[in-house]
Amino acid sequence: MSRIGKKPVAIPSGVTANVDGQLISVKGGKGQLSFAAPEDVTVVLGDGGIEVSPRNETKRARAMWGMTRSMVNNLVVGVSKGFERKLEITGVGYKAAVSGKNLQLSLGFSHDVTFPIPDGISIVAAKPTEVAISGIDKRQVGQIASEIRALRPPEPYKGKGVKYAGEFIFRKEGKKK
């Protein structure tokens, strides 16, 4: 039994949901999202919210049950509140600035890195060393944050690079004489 899958997804006020077969579409104050549920689960829109249940007792159906419920919950939270991921930039001369639809990053390379900001994503650089990525699609926000972090991941000796806010970087000791 999926403990996550058993709970129905509550729909807050200001959010409308529609279930058409396996396609779930959710509309709210921040926008509209849709998700195609796998064939292993059934999705029903009821009074208590959106309920997900497995079609049969196979291992795959049970796995898809909890995953589908989480995906539907992410749709509802995304269109009502949105998602945000913060990055911290550490290092001498390392900085970020938003110019138009691009994020300009100085990360210690011989050239500045230009990262295009996709549609549906908002990037704010309040300080040169802090970047906030926000949007309604949790997967896309996490993917963009991961791509920016991958440009210069934190190194273990001095901790220079791009890291998630609150991320612990395992530090190593330098060479001994």
From Swiss-Prot:
Is rRNA-binding among the key words of this record?
Answer: yes
Which key words tag this protein in UniProt?
Ribonucleoprotein, Ribosomal protein, RNA-binding, rRNA-binding
One GO molecular-function entry: structural constituent of ribosome
Gene Ontology CC terms? cytosolic large ribosomal subunit
Q: By its UniProt entry, which PROSITE patterns does this protein fall under?
A: RIBOSOMAL_L6_1
Q: Is the keyword Isomerase assigned to this protein?
A: no
One GO BP on record is: cytoplasmic translation
Q: Which domain of life is it from?
A: Bacteria
* Cystine pairings recorded for this chain: none
State the InterPro entries in the record: Ribosomal_uL6-like (IPR000702), Ribosomal_uL6-like_a/b-dom_sf (IPR036789), Ribosomal_uL6_a/b-dom (IPR020040), Ribosomal_uL6_bac-type (IPR019906), Ribosomal_uL6_CS (IPR002358)
**What Pfam families does UniProt report for this protein, alphabetically?**
Ribosomal_L6
Q: What is known about its subunit structure?
A: Part of the 50S ribosomal subunit.
Its biological purpose is as follows: This protein binds to the 23S rRNA, and is important in its secondary structure. It is located near the subunit interface in the base of the L7/L12 stalk, and near the tRNA binding site of the peptidyltransferase center.
Q: Which PANTHER family match?
A: 60S/50S RIBOSOMAL PROTEIN L6/L9 (PTHR11655), LARGE RIBOSOMAL SUBUNIT PROTEIN UL6M (PTHR11655:SF14)
NCBIfam families registered for this protein in UniProt = L6_bact
Similarity annotation: Belongs to the universal ribosomal protein uL6 family.
- What is the name of the protein in this document? Large ribosomal subunit protein uL6
